[in-house]
Structure formats: C-alpha cells, structure tokens
Amino acid sequence: MKIILKENFETLGKAGEIVKVADGYARNFLIPKGIAAEANLRNIKALEHDKQNIVRKAEKERKRHESLAASLSGVTCTIARRVGEQDKLFGSVTAMDIEEALLAQNVKIDRKSIVLDEPIKAIGEFPIVIKLGAGVTAEIKVNVVPEQA
C-alpha cells in the first residue's frame, strides 16, 4: 500500500514523501496514529497544496533541535556512584541515570534519545551522544565520580 507521510518517521522517511509499506502496517499503525494517510488521488492533491506548510513545519522543528543542541554543547553532568576495588562501580550508569542528572540541571531530554552503546561501569568522564531528531545530534559529558561516604 502506498502512503503519504504526514510527519518524519525515522524508519520510513520524511514528511510529505510517498512510500510503500505493508497493508497491515499502514491500516493498523501508521494511519490510526496520524503518521500517514493513504496515497489516493484526493490525498495527493491535498499534499501538493500542503507541501509548503509541511516543509515549514519540518524546518521549524529542525531549528528547534539545533538550538537545543547548541544549548547542550558543553553541558557536563556529574553522577556519584558507590565504587569497589579498582574503581569499579557497583551497578552501572544507564540512560535513565543520565536523564535524571540532566533533569536536575533543568534540561529535559527523553532517555530514548540518549545513545549508550553499553552502560558505564567505571569512574571517569565519558562523552555521550544525544539524538535530538531531524538528523541533529548533541554531545554532552558525563562525569562519574565515587560517592562520598
């Protein structure tokens, strides 16, 4: 089934594109959630009419993500954890911990956008990539320190 994307969808494409997907995926997920519309003649004509609006909305979203990335550059969050021998952490620092540390600094980031290849299990400073969307990423530093007893 051919559909018209109403908004950017990471696995399918950008808003305004016509893509082909499985019928069930379109009918049961994309169309009911308002992510896409069926690509019939009427909707294609409406798309041509609304294309300027879609492009403007996508550009506004990209600028918002870029300004957020600029505000995040240079941000360092410190997380204190109990350590054992050889500065090994008891447990690990996960995306949820980083999200909470950023919230304490009044920076609201969804933990799903924090990219961790694997949880942090050592003391030190680590660069962390945050995917903000629209192809925009930001990098912050996470400083893991031993907890004071």
Swiss-Prot record:
Belongs to the bacterial ribosomal protein bL9 family. Disulfide bonds: none annotated. It comes from the Bacteria. PANTHER family: 50S RIBOSOMAL PROTEIN L9. The gene is rplI. GO terms for biological process: translation. One of its GO terms (cellular component) is ribosome. This is Large ribosomal subunit protein bL9. One of its GO terms (molecular function) is rRNA binding. Keywords: Ribonucleoprotein, Ribosomal protein, RNA-binding, rRNA-binding. SUPFAM superfamilies: L9 N-domain-like, Ribosomal protein L9 C-domain. Binds to the 23S rRNA. PROSITE patterns: RIBOSOMAL_L9. Pfam families: Ribosomal_L9_C, Ribosomal_L9_N. It comes from Syntrophus aciditrophicus (strain SB).
